[in-house]
């Protein structure tokens, strides 16, 4: 491709509306242009990358045995009403009426459509398992679209849905999809972790997120230094720290009128934060017979709300008690709560159960207990894993310690179960001749988000550094002062024809521009291999080669250039 025949729309300045690197570079590299809030037009450079990502996804999905379909973007409301999500789904669901006053939605996801398709097409267990996928533009009416294509209203996703008659069969497909996703992200050149994840509102029995490690990520990814353990921080198991020692301090009440937070208690009384406990009060379930329940974590630890919701006595969704609700039961405010004589059920974190000689509120305003010890001063309450892990914690599998990095979720797989198939009566005839509700798995990849994540992970101060497999072009030919040098033009044209004939994707910069501008543009759009042709070097029989990722330059004999390039492509 010649730049003179190409929409080469690079920008020198960073647009003010772009706050993260991927958004900035996608705009500057001429990959996308904004149309409206959260809506983008993909220009040729961006579309070349998008098509390559989709190609890799298709190849691996086809290899897994999944079958590609194409579902409608517009979906009838009846299906959403049948599944129960017409009422459940929030304002992100774009609803409209057609000219016949019938309700429709622009699909943000496809569980209803695929379940309806399969229940119409399949009748027997002999037709299962079946795994169908498609790649489609979707729409969610995000309240605050931001970060370019990272969180846009319109986006491209790969969705797959599998159907089974047994959980064992589902597990086999789930394992295949786990491996398939790993292959996809490896081929895309991404540094990622597959992490255990909460099933959330989608439900199901198992779930993994595929997280690309990047500082701009919105999620905390936890993984071991010495094993394959990896989990979203919401699900990462926190082991008990330390061992409970002897009760060496007397229990005493201390006036603490100006210590209403853990930080103030530590500062004013020279108390190690590891010897403090904070008490968080939340609503209890109706079945428990209590209004409130107290959750205790160490002073320097954070409550994990997902874990807390899984405690039997805790109401879901988690709701913290107000100061008024707490005072009505305890007679003291939130900054003075503790486990001794607390008139509500208590659940303590594993690490709190191992503490000794610690301090906590005395359930009187302006007073704290110091020197609290379990069993001597009060019985050990119910123990649960309540906290977020912290970097340096032992890995729960006993191998290594935990590291925490930011991650961008680009894929998610679920063992979905019968949530949709049961609601929509999607059955087949089982081996026993009776109707059997199909068991489902679902598997998603945010295709456009993958591109943004790749840029977040692969860039420098000069621009994008694409992994070779998804770069818009493989080679950039930069002829210096070509329009003033017949020898440079002749060699550049011949090289361009030869590489193009070999199937190499080449961007040939034939603009009448200064060399510095040409170099900057090719580095900005992230072409991996740059060939610089200069008149003086040609006279010496040499061509300059530059590798984008390392910045390494070398001179190559011009009669060996094609062989050297071939070797570099292979490596």
From Swiss-Prot:
Catalytic activity line of the entry: tRNA(Pro) + L-proline + ATP = L-prolyl-tRNA(Pro) + AMP + diphosphate
HAMAP family in the cross-refs: Pro_tRNA_synth_type1
Function: Catalyzes the attachment of proline to tRNA(Pro) in a two-step reaction: proline is first activated by ATP to form Pro-AMP and then transferred to the acceptor end of tRNA(Pro). As ProRS can inadvertently accommodate and process non-cognate amino acids such as alanine and cysteine, to avoid such errors it has two additional distinct editing activities against alanine. One activity is designated as 'pretransfer' editing and involves the tRNA(Pro)-independent hydrolysis of activated Ala-AMP.
MF GO annotations: aminoacyl-tRNA deacylase activity; ATP binding; proline-tRNA ligase activity
Compartments, record wording: Cytoplasm
Domain of life, source organism: Bacteria
Entry keywords, A to Z: Aminoacyl-tRNA synthetase, ATP-binding, Cytoplasm, Ligase, Nucleotide-binding, Protein biosynthesis
Protein name: Proline--tRNA ligase
EC numbers on record: 6.1.1.15
GO BP annotations listed: prolyl-tRNA aminoacylation
Subunit: Homodimer.
UniProt GO cellular component terms: cytosol
KW Cell wall biogenesis/degradation (keyword) present: no
Major site of localization recorded for this protein: cytoplasm
SUPFAM superfamilies reported in the protein's UniProt record: Class II aaRS ABD-related, Class II aaRS and biotin synthetases, YbaK/ProRS associated domain
Domain free text: Consists of three domains: the N-terminal catalytic domain, the editing domain and the C-terminal anticodon-binding domain.
InterPro entries noted in UniProt: aa-tRNA-synt_IIb, aa-tRNA-synth_II, aa-tRNA-synth_II/BPL/LPL, Anticodon-bd, Anticodon-bd_dom_sf, Pro-tRNA-ligase_IIa, Pro-tRNA-synth_IIa_bac-type, Pro-tRNA-Synthase_IIa_type1
Matching Pfam families: HGTP_anticodon, tRNA-synt_2b, tRNA_edit
Alphabetized Gene3D superfamilies for the sequence: Anticodon-binding domain, Bira Bifunctional Protein, Domain 2
Residues that span the membrane, as ranges: none
Family, per entry: Belongs to the class-II aminoacyl-tRNA synthetase family. ProS type 1 subfamily.
Keyword Repeat included in the entry's annotation: no
